Amino acid sequence: ALLNKDFRQSLGFAIDRTNYAAQLNGKEGGSTAVRNIYVKPDFVQADGKDFGTMVMDQLPSYGDEWSGVNLADSQDGLYNPEKAKAEFAKAKEALQAEGVQFPIHLDVPVNQSSKITVNQVQSIKQSVESALGKDNVVLDIHQLSADDFNNITYSASNAAAEDWDLSVGVAWDPDYLDPSTYLDVLKTTSSENTKSFMGYDDPNSQAVEKVGLKEYDQLVDD
């Protein structure tokens, strides 16, 4: 199901990031910690615009569902249950034609020793299942020891060891002042990172092609 773009977009619109952030920062500080884009919006500027604004200008060309999306920090510009439902409806029709059974179960591992992280994952479960309906999508949270969690995320020996669907167990900090310091991490040629971030070893697999990562490579290079 995760290979379906509409399904992935439905999940993106279904996650309440303010509530997620509030598990660490408190209710009043939840929104201030929200970021809606992988690259920090004001990380770099060109032609009088910051990076986030340049991306927002192009978003509508990706699909009508992206019109009006605000990528600025400290507000949840992506959480939209109505858009989530609309995207899921498109995905469900295609997935049913492929024989996918509902509800779709998504495995989500979490380090059980971190109460805050457990609460964050539970907040994702609540918002996704509320927006899309438990008869459509169920998040199965797997609370693991710190060692077991690390062995399937940060310290996984290979992609096959990363047997999960969603995870909060990955992170990245920039190394230099260019968007590529973020964007290159997700290129198919970034072998160690593709294993850790997206769970694949073979850059030429059918899944890589289907979700558009080869096209992503070209866009970053251009």
Predicted regions located by residue number:
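Structural alpha-beta junctions
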Residues: 129-141
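Short secondary-structure boundary/capping segments
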Residues: 27-30, 124-125, 156-158, 181-188
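Short helices/loops that flank or line small-molecule/ion binding pockets
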Residues: 6, 122-130, 147-164
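Short, glycine-/Ser/Thr-/acidic-enriched flexible segments
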Residues: 113, 171-174
